[in-house]
Regions:
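Charge-dense, helix-prone N-terminal extensions
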Residues: 1-129
């Protein structure tokens, strides 16, 4: 059964359905990002959360990814991480919790892996509190 989040937007049932709906140019870009994240954290589980593919580890969200009309985004869900990598992220549009990049030009794999690993450390630190 399809879940709806509003009258006009159907939430994808799973990550594969999300990718099937994405236009090809964005899908290719997002698949590269997805592959990099999987390599950085192979034990992560992919789910749909807030209508986007989300990588979770130990039931805690690490990062979300999304495709939009003219760009793709990586959502580290952490302003602290964006500040920590501010210099490396300078070529990209960033906001409070988003790294936006053009279609066909994903964020370098080494930087994505740093962000993901930093999110793992953040989640582990929160768990200890």
């Amino acid at each position: 059964m399809q879940r709806t989040t509003s009258a006009t937007h159907l939430q994808p049932a799973d990550v594969e359905e999300y990718f099937a709906r994405v236009p090809e140019e964005a899908r290719v870009t997002l698949e590269k990002l997805r592959k990099t994240i999987r390599a950085a954290v192979p034990k992560a589980v992919e789910v749909i959360w807030y209508q986007m593919p989300t990588f979770k580890l130990n039931e805690r969200p690490l990062v979300c990814i999304g495709a939009f009309k003219n760009h793709c985004s990586l959502f580290p869900m952490s302003g602290a991480i964006l500040k920590a990598y501010k210099d490396e992220l300078e070529p990209y549009y960033t906001s409070k919790g988003t790294i936006r990049f053009p279609l066909g030009k994903p964020v370098p794999a080494t930087l994505v892996k740093k962000v993901v690993k930093a999110r793992i450390l953040e989640n582990e630190a929160r768990k200890k509190r």
